[in-house]
Amino acid sequence: MDASTVQELLRGGYEKVYEAGAIIAGGHTIHGAEPIYGLAVTGFLHPDRVLTNAGARPGDVLLLTKPIGIGVLTTAQKAEMLSPEGQALAERLMTTLNKSARDAMVRYRVHACPDVTGFGLLGHSFEMAQGSGVELELNVDAIDLIPEALEFARMGLLPAGMYRNRTFAEPGVDAGVIELCKQDLLYDPQTAGGLLMAVDPADAEALYRELQGCVPSAQRIGTVREYRGGKRIFLR
């Protein structure tokens, strides 16, 4: 890897850190066979303003801020099967911060908010349901599944992480009659995925409208219910 490529990597990282309102305060170098780049975040947060993946309440409305399918797209890219349009979409989604969604969210009553990353939508939903002592109903038709990712899922082109996520969460999921390829995408590990918000029903419509102004891909995907025993997630 030449010096100009390294320079571009560092510049891109700096620009995103600056966009998030933070600063680069140091660094270190790792020698290895493959180039890697990452960031560790250190900061302070008022304990009364912490949002975790627990705290969702029955009646809450579930909002999701990004489409699903990034893991499948990046797997297809490694196999040199991804279209130029798919690559551009993946890059745009992965380089879009959750800052705008977060800035909108803090003005409303949001009871829980994991980011959807390596465990996929169903993995993080399962953790939220367990941690909150509730169950979730997800409307699969309302979830923005990336069309090209869905086609790859139908072909069986899936990341290894999808299978691990399925093993983890599937015992707690009632998939109903949902098509298998759509289930696969719901387990797809996301890189730089969106936020999954459990919103007080009195605030849900107003927050949803505000999110649509700054996060066009925002979706209203389900509801939180009282836990009745048994499964935690119900796909409809």
Language-model regions, residue ranges each:
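Helix-biased detector of long, well-ordered alpha-helical tracts
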Residues: 1-236
